[in-house]
Amino acid sequence: MEDKNILYGPEPFHPLADGTAGEQMFYALSRYADISGCIALTNAHTKENVLYEEFLKLSCRLAESFKKYGLKQNDTIAVCSENGLQFFLPLIASLYLGIIAAPVSDKYIERELIHSLGIVKPRIIFCSKNTFQKVLNVKSKLKYVETIIILDLNEDLGGYQCLNNFISQNSDINLDVKKFKPNSFNRDDQVALVMFSSGTTGVSKGVMLTHKNIVARFSHCKDPTFGNAINPTTAILTVIPFHHGFGMTTTLGYFTCGFRVALMHTFEEKLFLQSLQDYKVESTLLVPTLMAFFPKSALVEKYDLSHLKEIASGGAPLSKEIGEMVKKRFKLNFVRQGYGLTETTSAVLITPDTDVRPGSTGKIVPFHAVKVVDPTTGKILGPNETGELYFKGDMIMKSYYNNEEATKAIINKDGWLRSGDIAYYDNDGHFYIVDRLKSLIKYKGYQVAPAEIEGILLQHPYIVDAGVTGIPDEAAGELPAAGVVVQTGKYLNEQIVQNFVSSQVSTAKWLRGGVKFLDEIPKGSTGKIDRKVLRQMFEKHKSKL
């Protein structure tokens, strides 16, 4: 008998469609290619556009080029590039053929690249002109890499082909896309992508996502409750890195809906707001650290953002306070939150637009189940009891690439995946993230969630960004400490900040480890606070027990 405290997703608005992720992508692109002038991608920095018609033809020609080059099903390619118009072409061509694609961060240093590429051993690395030199340096140390292809140049560089020349040399410019046919294979087993975990709890691991995992995400994207109503030409603006799971699977889903994806490779406040206005953007993707910026920005009122209907937040927990401030500033009905891991393909908890609860990260999505488990006893907990989240369903990864030990540590024999995150759900099944299990600060036996204190700090009118960590202390175990960024022209001191927090929380959450005033909070490439680096800034602290 199933435990009554296991929660299941609702019936899907769209059942899982037949076919592989490549077949579904091909048929979707074909449909939108027939709409005259339908734009697939816009580079917000350069204003360049790519039409769905062109996007489809290039992806098919690249797939044919892969075949002529000699790539076969289960061979691997890698992509190391910032967000760009060409980023998804090798990925979609790979989906067509059953080739495995491995996106890696353009921010990786050579040591990190060597580690990640060494897991999947790609035959080809696609890069940008910005990452070319770094990738070239790495290639000399990786004998399995046969060649490098530069995505965003129109001419070859250093003896290596640009994407346009590779396609021209290996495929017919007059290719009839209506005669192109993606390969068919077992979507349940065939790996589509290897995404790399963030490595915040150790070295990064290769997360194997199957075609079925991706197809389930496509279904959610078309769901009007958990995703979007299908409306070609709807404009989306994203600054989320495409190599990140949130940016990757969400954007792939957008293509199946025929949306116009306006991309940014770096966040620039004025350009972001200008793009929202110019492209009449209806939905945008942000991480919470960027969300915190807008409630206090003087620029927001200078732009016409009347088309904006939704801001979607993911990648890290969003505090209730910031969510409410952003909603009010942009005059939105709600801010859509999502919660997921690289290992769950995409968000498995999403705010349903029919039932919004401030501070909640959402409800369990179709095709999935969730339970909250006591980390100590293993007991399945009920409503309003805090424990670790476990998930099961169609978007759970196949395994870690060539790492059976790590796979067994995160997925149990019954197929439940441990999230490593602490949360609870209310009586109506809305979930609330407390913090990472490993991020919790242990103060005199009490567990303190950094995200809670960060949410309070960001309520202060002079604080534009904040990060909280625990620093070692012999007497207490760990002391909560905060780094804060103060608004230009405003003044705060340590005592003011400590008093502001202590007036709103229990004594275990006081900032006894101190406060540091920083120019910026240390963060990773996806905007998550790097608590390890932040902790190092507090090595010389004074206990204030």
From Swiss-Prot:
Pfam families for this protein: AMP-binding, AMP-binding_C
Cofactor(s) this protein cannot do without: Mg(2+)
GO terms (BP aspect): bioluminescence
Alphabetical UniProt keywords: ATP-binding, Luminescence, Magnesium, Metal-binding, Monooxygenase, Nucleotide-binding, Oxidoreductase, Peroxisome, Photoprotein
The reaction(s) this protein catalyses: firefly D-luciferin + ATP + O2 = firefly oxyluciferin + hnu + AMP + CO2 + diphosphate
Gene3D superfamilies the UniProt entry points to: 3.30.300.30, 3.40.50.980, Luciferase, Domain 3 (2.30.38.10)
Main location: other
CDD domains xrefs: Firefly_Luc
A cellular-component GO term for this protein: peroxisome
Function, in words: Produces green light with a wavelength of 562 nm.
Record-stated family: Belongs to the ATP-dependent AMP-binding enzyme family.
The protein, known as: Luciferin 4-monooxygenase
Organism placement in taxonomy: Eukaryota, Metazoa, Ecdysozoa, Arthropoda, Hexapoda
